[in-house]
């Protein structure tokens, strides 16, 4: 018996297999499953899940590398951060830290302190998607540094369900808030 769930039905397929295990009943055959049948189903399900996880990890790393390249567009001397919003394996928005449109592209004052009106990469990407015909609801945000508290509020309100980041910022209150809101946070330190 081969299990080949589609990506769309993966969760419901997993749930029905688990339900079958719990009831020891296969609705297709209308007889109890033997231990060997259960083990076979479990092994096939595990193989599908492992393959999906490996593909997801590969895509996560690729999108993070894209966010890192996008960060190079920032004029900030102190820290360059890039962000990409992905939905259904399509990039729907991007952003990098910098000044608002129409301002000079200088992020720091003469003493090297970041100007107060500089936007973070996440905020730039979220506001960009808000002005488009796309929706960030259910999407994934890839960002080169973990979000701050203010950006985390925007992430929650925009409907983003997953945040993948490269560098862990020393202040973790943003990540803590995202986790409290039920948003999956994935730290990939090595690309």
Question: Language-model features: where?
Answer:
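Residue-level signal for mature regions of secreted extracellular proteins and peptides
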Residues: 2-4, 141
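Zinc-dependent deaminase catalytic domain
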Residues: 32-191
């Amino acid at each position: 018996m081969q299990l080949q769930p589609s990506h769309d039905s993966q969760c419901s397929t997993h749930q029905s297999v688990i339900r079958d295990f719990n009831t020891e009943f296969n609705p297709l055959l209308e007889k109890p499953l033997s231990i060997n049948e259960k083990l076979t189903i479990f092994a096939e399900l595990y193989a599908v899940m492992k393959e999906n996880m490996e593909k997801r990890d590969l895509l996560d790393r690729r999108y993070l590398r894209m966010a890192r390249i996008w960060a190079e567009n920032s004029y900030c001397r102190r820290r360059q951060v890039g962000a990409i919003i992905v939905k259904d394996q399509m990039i729907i928005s991007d952003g990098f830290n910098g000044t608002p449109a129409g301002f000079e592209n200088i992020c720091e004052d003469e003493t090297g302190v970041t100007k107060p009106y500089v936007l973070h990469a996440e905020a730039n990407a979220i506001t960009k998607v808000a002005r488009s015909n796309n929706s960030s609801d259910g999407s994934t945000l890839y960002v080169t540094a973990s979000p701050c508290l203010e950006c985390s509020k925007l992430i929650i309100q925009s409907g983003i369900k997953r945040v993948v980041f490269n560098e862990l910022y020393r202040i973790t209150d943003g990540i803590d808030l995202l986790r409290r809101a039920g948003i999956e946070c994935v730290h990939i330190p090595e690309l």
